[in-house]
């Protein structure tokens, strides 16, 4: 890091002449009891197992039940039976393995049992229905919008362009081993009047740090879901760049005897804002999914998301969960090309 900082310093002198489950988020050991009335919304991370859905309410689970039977109906109103993905126990507990987008939807269980009067042995059949709304979700992909400022001798002259290209190259080299890169870099030169210092010229530089550099999939080690890896990498990339600019201020104020070149980093000018994006077929909706507001939740029927936006768009002809396109719509997501 220090070597890179010194390299930039030399360039500057040369150019100037001198990261617990929430209410309905559960891990593999979670258990959710049924409720009558409005169904709970349950969020299951993509490719993970769902929590165990229990076909009775908590109060009833503490009582003796005679001759219980359980009937589970899944999305698309299909009767569910045990298979390699759906696990249903003899006591009516359901778990879905390796949860995918199309498995989202309404899960309904009907519990039938008998009450028996001790005096007359009279039997009465009781039925109760429990609804569970289950949604696939995935963590958002992180990127960072950054802005910094550098003083410059003048807003006229090619050395500003040269410095800008050198800075981008240095930043890319800092984070290339993390499969991250700098995108959408830009700068403008402004005249800034500072009290007691008069008028100076500054470069206002902006760029985005993105975790999807060419070949980024190689860092996933073959995993189906790579958000954990890419988000971990982008956090490291953010930290390295922040350390780099902090080191710039340190070098100038401690290694150059208080004499700064005409072009230098403006201390405390670094601004960092996290940007979230969702993969195609997923989006954020704080109103509909308040218990998973920061999640990228699968797009519901009648909506779709073709790109990395965080909003599911309306498309009345879509009948499935996780739609990435709408009939007669052809949007292509470029960010995730390898």
UniProtKB/Swiss-Prot annotation:
Cleavable signal peptide: 1-20
GO biological process: acrosome assembly; binding of sperm to zona pellucida; circadian regulation of gene expression; membrane lipid catabolic process; negative regulation of immunoglobulin production; sphingolipid metabolic process
Cellular location(s): Cytoplasmic vesicle, Secretory vesicle, Acrosome; Secreted
Known glycosylation sites: 87, 221, 257, 309
Post-translational modification: N-glycosylated.
Keyword Transferase included in the entry's annotation: no
Function recorded in the entry: Is implicated in sperm-oocyte interaction during fertilization.
Full protein name: Zona pellucida-binding protein 2
